[in-house]
């Protein structure tokens, strides 16, 4: 008997894009996420940010075996009670609200969650944490992001007794990243499970009380040799969906 193919929800960016004769806002996601999930044996399903008064994010989870929260623009600092820094990018309030609600509903169901870059930051904020809005102010360097449109290569040190180490298959990992923000206050119930070699920037967070809840600041989908997405999809394969009506 063949293994069940898990449905993996993939959150989308909101960007103004040009295609053909049209320029308009669109929901989009880099194909690297889609292909990484498919290579690992999952069925990627794209989830566009939708206002909560139109779609209850928790009802979407009836269709899913796991959620991957993708990278993208900065989160509105108001979501963690701070004013915007001069270097904070223009925010997408609808996406912020949608993903925070989606994560909280997924956590309630103990559905596997993987947060990538911004997605890790969404997990942290959903747990009541806060973000450092511009790391170069403190670090006095910007090695966590490459030139425009290019990922930076660096290394992270992973705690040996962590989900991050189990998923990555190593405690010292070469990664690709592109970010200027990071975790300043870790969310309630989360643990730091990886840090950047050299400057100690928080690179991974997880909730050991959950089946699989992991956020990484790097981009595992950009490296075909990376094992994280595969570990996540395997956990999704074993997940059991719990329809909303049955929980009522």
Question: What do these predicted regions represent?
Answer:
Residues 1-114, 124-127, 132, 136-167, ...:
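N-terminal beta1-alpha1 cap of cysteine-dependent amidohydrolase-like domains
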Residues 117:
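Conserved G/P- and acidic residue-centered "switch" motifs that form tight phosphate/ATP-binding loops
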Residues 120-122:
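Hydrophobic, aromatic-enriched interface-forming segments
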Residues 214-218:
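Active-site-proximal beta-strand elements of phosphoester/diester hydrolases
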């Amino acid at each position: 008997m063949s293994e069940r193919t898990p449905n993996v929800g993939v959150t989308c960016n909101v960007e103004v894009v040009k295609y053909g004769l049209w320029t308009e806002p669109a929901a989009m996601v880099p194909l690297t996420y889609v292909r990484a999930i498919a290579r690992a044996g999952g069925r990627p399903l794209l989830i566009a940010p939708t206002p909560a008064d139109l779609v209850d994010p928790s009802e979407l989870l009836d269709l899913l075996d796991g959620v991957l929260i993708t990278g993208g623009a900065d989160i509105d600092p108001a979501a963690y009670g701070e004013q915007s820094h001069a270097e904070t990018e223009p925010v997408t309030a609808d996406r912020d609200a949608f993903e925070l609600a989606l994560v909280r509903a997924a956590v309630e169901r103990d559905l596997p969650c993987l947060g990538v870059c911004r997605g890790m930051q969404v997990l942290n904020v959903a747990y009541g944490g806060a973000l450092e809005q511009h790391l170069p102010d403190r670090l006095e360097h910007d090695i966590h992001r490459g030139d425009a449109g290019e990922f930076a290569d660096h290394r992270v040190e992973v705690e040996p007794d962590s989900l991050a180490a189990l998923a990555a298959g190593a405690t010292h990992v070469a990664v690709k990243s592109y970010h200027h923000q990071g975790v300043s206050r870790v969310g309630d119930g989360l643990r730091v499970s990886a840090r950047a070699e050299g400057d100690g920037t928080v690179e991974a967070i997880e909730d050991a009380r959950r089946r699989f809840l992991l956020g990484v600041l790097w981009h595992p989908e950009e490296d075909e040799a990376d094992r994280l997405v595969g570990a996540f999809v395997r956990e999704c394969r074993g997940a059991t969906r719990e329809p909303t009506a049955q929980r009522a």
